[in-house]
């Protein structure tokens, strides 16, 4: 069902702040959205892993994150 839909990486930045989203399979073959955010040049920050039932659901979650980041003034880097 998820053929043709693979891993995805996106990054947003605003000033010294960054936000990353990564869609990939975990060791069990399940799709996981990993969110990483913090300040550039700092070891402080947060990581959050959100499991999703399919690659499509994970990619839709990235689009939701993208809309939220744009609304908050972040520029998409990749």
Each predicted region: which residue ranges?
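Short aromatic-glycine-(Arg/Gly/Cys) micro-motifs in beta-strand/loop hairpins
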Residues: 23-48, 63, 72
């Amino acid at each position: 069902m998820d053929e043709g839909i693979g891993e995805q990486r996106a990054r947003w930045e605003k000033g010294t702040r960054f936000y990353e989203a990564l869609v990939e399979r975990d060791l069990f073959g399940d799709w996981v959205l990993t969110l990483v955010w913090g300040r550039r040049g700092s070891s402080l920050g947060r990581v959050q892993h959100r499991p999703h039932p399919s690659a499509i659901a994970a990619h839709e979650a990235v689009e939701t994150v993208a809309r939220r980041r744009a609304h908050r003034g972040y520029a998409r880097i990749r």
